[in-house]
Amino acid sequence: MTAPRPAVRLVVLDMAGTTVADGGLVEQAFGAATATLGLEAGSAEHARMLDHVRATMGESKISVFRHLFGDEDTAQQANLAFEAAYHDLIDGGSCAPLPGAEQAIGALRDGGLKVVLTTGFSRATQDRILDALGWQDIADLTLCPADAGRGRPYPDMVLTALLRTATDDVRQIAVCGDTGYDMLTGVRAGASVVAGVLTGAHDEARLRTDGATEVLASVAELPGLLLQEER
């Protein structure tokens, strides 16, 4: 007889597009970054790169730039320009929580689950977002790719969250995000719940193709899914 799956004890949440409204900020910052490198908006090359950015939403941004430019110095230059542009957008008031996100995180923690916020951004950008939202203490832990080794779609951040929170079993993990790479990360980490949300980059078909076990309208529905196990 197969043993029942243990109840979820750890929730690993994405930020932009899942708990934080993106509103096209990534694409705006990408446009600013490529402009510094002389890439003309509207050109065929710019369109090709933007398609790749959209397809790989959730991936570590420096990894995206390495793929696009194939040269470390150029990738680092683009990444610095991207971060500067993104920080300007945050400082200009373009950063806001998605409806119900704060309440969902609070409900999950009140229900005894540990919550970890993860991102494909650098630590500097992640902290900028957290500071802008007043979210420094909203979660048990926050992680970026540099904290774990590799970013999405690799399982490193999820497994680092498991280790840092002393969670016993990968089956006690729920991963929630808005991109296919979030789903792949959850699957590769062995999470029992891999929940996609429709508030960000990718549609239900992409989320399910990449391994979603559930697709929710938004993160606001996540406590209802996970906390019913505790009843």
Predicted regions and their residues:
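A short, structured active-site edge motif that brings together acidic residues
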Residues: 52-54, 135-151, 172
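Conserved Lys-Pro-Asp/Glu-containing loop-to-beta segment of HAD-superfamily phosphomonoesterases
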Residues: 152-183
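N-terminal helical cap/lid subdomain that shapes the substrate entry/recognition surface
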Residues: 4-106
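Structural recognition of alpha->loop->beta junctions
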Residues: 134-144, 206-224
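Surface-exposed amphipathic alpha-helices with a cationic face
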Residues: 102-110, 162-163, 183-188
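Substrate-recognition element of Asp-dependent hydrolases with the DxDx(T/V) motif
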Residues: 30, 101-133, 143
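Short acidic capping loops at alpha-helix termini that bridge into adjacent secondary structure
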Residues: 45-48, 137-141, 169-173, 193
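Acidic, Mg2+-coordinating phosphoryl-transfer loop and its flanking beta/alpha structural elements
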Residues: 174-214
